[in-house]
């Protein structure tokens, strides 16, 4: 191969810098695990893992973009290289095969990738879209049929709640009977959606069942507001993925 030009040397230097960053990130994580007592916090470990993941993605993209050049390069020592004092480094540079452990990782990754590409039983994008369009309506209808919110399902009520074997020592009470016995004043409140189903006939779309909330729901909402501010969904998802506690608003 002819001598390298400046652009090719720049690509090699970028490869070296990315590998150095990955090595330092891994060394930092290993050091924190070995030296910290107790172990580092979850947010710290998650942050270090995120940095390592970003470094791996950067190296993978860089190697893929410059695959032709890197696969054609051949390393050999120059006359001025200290081969006697730097023999281990020279052996690593001149090595043509991967480490046995690394070679096993690579082969397993290639097999997993090939099997994923050959998996023709997976749903297509149109089938997935149709599934997501069908699932919410069916789940809502199933929930309405079974009345998941109470202690007993609709089928258990029809067969008699006294015949239901719960395995509990305490006696479960039917929520419908409690509601009929308690007399509370109905306040004017906003309507809410309690059911959804597909519209039959020529017109396409969905039909929604609207009903007033149960008595006392406004009081429950006021109690919830008094208990503390609600945490936004974005902060909850951020805490689940990064371990960083949500900020109080």
Swiss-Prot record:
Annotated coiled-coil segments of the chain? 154-200
Pfam families assigned to the protein according to its UniProt record, in alphabetical order: Med8
Q: Which GO terms describe its cellular component?
A: core mediator complex; mediator complex
Print the keywords alphabetically. Answer: Activator, Coiled coil, Nucleus, Transcription, Transcription regulation
Keyword Coiled coil on entry: yes
Family membership, please give it: Belongs to the Mediator complex subunit 8 family.
> Which Gene Ontology BP terms does the record give?
regulation of transcription by RNA polymerase II
Q: Which organism is it from?
A: Aspergillus fumigatus (strain ATCC MYA-4609 / CBS 101355 / FGSC A1100 / Af293)
The UniProt GO MF terms for this protein read: RNA polymerase II cis-regulatory region sequence-specific DNA binding; transcription coregulator activity
Q: What is this protein called?
A: Mediator of RNA polymerase II transcription subunit 8
Q: Where is this region: Disordered?
A: 170-249
